[in-house]
Amino acid sequence: MSSGYFERADPAGEHRLELAARAAWLYYFKGRTQEQIANELKVSRQIVQRLIALANAERLIRFQLMHPMAKCIELAERLRDRFDLVYCDVCLTESNNKDDTPSVATQATFYLEKVLDQVAPMTIGLGSGGTMREISHRLPPMDRPQHRCVSLMGNITRDGRATHYDVVTRLAERLNGQCYPFPVPVVTHTVAEKELLQAQPGYNALSAIVAEASLLVMGIGYWGPEATLYKDGFITAAELGQAMAAGAVGELLGCAISADGVIVGADYHERLTSFIRTQPADRPTTIVASGVYRAPAIRAALHGRLANSLITDENTAHLVLDLN
């Protein structure tokens, strides 16, 4: 239909913009199809397409997403831009508490489902802690025996007591995948004890698998009197205080970090057995965390490039952005 109104009119100037505005209004606001608009304006569908494209090019259209997730999408974009992240996902905060770990763990599970659904073999490095445990419980059963799950840190105290955060075994079980735990103390009694552990063939084999991991996923800890690393018995009160005096605001894989994302000069670090990250992160390294107390630690890790991906909730996202 090419001999209609549009062809008889002057296609240039203000009249063309008026037609573009009308076509865009019918398409976006009234929900008409391009065929319906073509019949109403007495032009071809091809011209309707050009008119809508012109309306967009001339910025005649402004979109507003009317959904609660819109603010989460905006927060994720702001975090991505602020910290130059390779991935960021912000979920709705469904709790009135200062910590909404269940929602964040669920969101992280959706992310891992998509990543782990691939057929090609992959290795994923996993941190420890309550948030990671929540993720391992939420992941649905998947038959991926070709995938490998490797722990990035130990889960034993100096006196031999294990924690309840056996994340790697649980997640590998859900995947029907290969499991590589790290059954050593998080912090040893002495440097010599740590060096003895690192000299074992099993440690070197595990270290090689960690180096091959294409994705690292971990929680992050608050640093203070209620710090998980201290409450679970991995470090002493004196070690906690010494790191705090050195400027620690958070903990990543057992490592105390400052507000600038720098690993502080904590004495226990020379006895820490976890696989310390490179700085900046050299592969997708995702922090999954929620809570007002963790916000300074999250901001520090992202600012210091210890991690380059984040999954969190909207309240925590606001706090991290405000801290910057």
Report each predicted region and the residues it spans.
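Generic hydrophobic alpha-helical segments
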Residues: 23, 104, 108-112, 135, ...
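Short Gly/Thr/Asp-enriched flexible loops that form oxyanion-binding sites at enzyme active sites
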Residues: 131-142, 228-238
